[in-house]
Structures are given as structure tokens and as C-alpha cells.
């Protein structure tokens, strides 16, 4: 995944190196997740439901139109104390369109389950077996649409499609799929 991100960044930089985007300002973007939905279902066929996620999205866009970012958020499952914790590194491109901001990007990182019995080294006191979960690799693509409020500030909405199929139970080797979609809002500051 890292090779794909680096190759995409290099190719796009070479293709767009004569574009007017090089005069664009630096931008710092701060966002928060608003909704997290899961594409998989529980073992009984019911939908996996989540409470509102907490965390942040941070992005820094450079004058060349490309940027780097970090996503870090936790989503609590409804009716449970368990959470899924997601951490991603992102690379993105902002199209050079006046007044509106359109961003596309890719991310790579980790997801893990967080609960009292989810730690990788957790041993069930009754059975003596390790029943915890290993953190899994995750990837995402995302897009963001923003509108400038002033020359220095814009407000934006984002959509992330997260693939996370590799959270593995230590004892059984069963892999858990917590892929899904995350929607967020944020502000970007130009300088």
C-alpha cells in the first residue's frame, strides 16, 4: 500500500508540475468524525451499530496541491463498551478549483479492538486460552468537499471508505471484518 501511495504521489507531481497550483497557499485542515457505519453484519445477521465516533482528522496541504494527514478516532459499539480504534496516515491531492475545495486521497494504517478482553495478550481466566485480538492493517480512500467562507477559512465535509479485514483473534485465528464508512466535518485555514 505504501508503494502505491508513493508511486501515485510521484506520478501526479511529475504530471502536474507546470500547473498553477504551485502558487496555492499552505493549508491546515482540522476535522472530526460525525458518523461511522459498518458494511459487515454480526454473526446473527444483524447490522453492526455504532455510537458517534470521537477523534480527529488533521491534514497539511503544501503549495504544490499535495498534502499529508493523520486520522485518529475511536468508535464505540452500541450497547457495548467495546470500541474499534483507527489510526491512518494519509496522502491527498487538492484540485486547483477557485472557491470550492475538492480533495481526494489514500490512507494506510491500523485498526484494533479496545475492550477489557480484547488486548492481544488477554487470557480468559476460565479457559486459560488467549482470546484477545491482534491489531490489523487498514486502508482507505477518501474525498472532501469544501466551500470557502473567507479567503482564509473554508468548511468541508469528508467521506472515508475504510477497509479493515485483518483484526485477528489470537486463539482461533478468525479474522474480523470492521470495514465501513466514516463521514466528517471540518475547517481548513489558509496561510
Placement of each model-derived feature along the sequence:
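Outer-membrane beta-barrel and related beta-rich outer-membrane complex signature
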Residues: 40-44, 80-82, 116-118, 167-171
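Cleavable N-terminal export/targeting peptides
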Residues: 1-27
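Hydrophobic secondary-structure block in the mid-to-C-terminal portion of proteins
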Residues: 156-191
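Gram-negative (and chloroplast) outer-membrane scaffold detector with strong preference
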Residues: 32, 56-127, 134-139, 147, ...
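Short loop/turn motifs that connect adjacent beta-strands in outer-membrane beta-barrel proteins
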Residues: 22-25, 96-102, 149-155
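Surface-exposed strand-loop-strand hairpins of Gram-negative outer-membrane beta-barrel proteins
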Residues: 35-56, 127-135, 165-167
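Secretion/assembly modules of Gram-negative surface proteins
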Residues: 22-27, 46-61, 90-92, 144
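Transmembrane beta-strand segments of Gram-negative outer membrane beta-barrel proteins
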Residues: 23-36, 66
Amino acid at each position: 500500500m505504501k508503494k502505491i501511495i508513493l508511486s501515485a504521489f510521484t506520478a501526479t507531481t511529475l504530471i502536474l508540475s507546470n500547473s498553477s497550483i504551485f502558487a496555492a497557499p499552505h493549508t491546515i485542515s482540522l476535522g472530526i468524525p460525525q458518523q461511522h457505519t459498518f458494511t459487515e453484519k454480526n454473526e446473527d445477521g444483524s447490522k453492526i451499530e455504532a455510537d458517534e465516533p470521537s477523534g480527529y482528522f488533521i491534514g497539511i496541504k503544501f503549495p504544490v496541491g499535495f498534502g499529508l494527514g493523520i486520522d485518529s478516532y475511536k468508535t464505540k459499539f452500541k450497547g457495548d463498551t467495546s470500541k474499534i480504534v483507527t489510526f491512518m496516515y494519509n496522502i491527498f491531492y487538492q484540485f486547483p478549483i477557485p472557491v470550492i475545495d475538492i480533495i481526494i486521497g489514500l490512507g494506510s494504517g491500523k485498526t484494533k479492538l479496545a475492550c477489557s478482553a480484547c488486548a492481544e495478550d488477554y487470557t480468559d481466566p476460565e479457559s486459560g486460552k488467549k482470546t484477545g485480538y491482534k491489531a490489523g492493517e487498514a486502508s482507505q480512500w477518501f474525498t472532501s468537499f469544501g466551500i470557502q467562507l473567507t479567503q482564509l477559512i473554508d468548511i468541508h465535509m469528508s467521506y472515508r471508505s475504510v477497509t479493515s479485514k485483518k483484526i485477528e483473534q489470537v486463539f482461533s485465528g478468525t479474522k474480523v471484518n470492521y470495514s465501513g464508512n466514516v463521514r466528517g466535518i471540518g475547517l481548513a485555514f489558509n496561510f
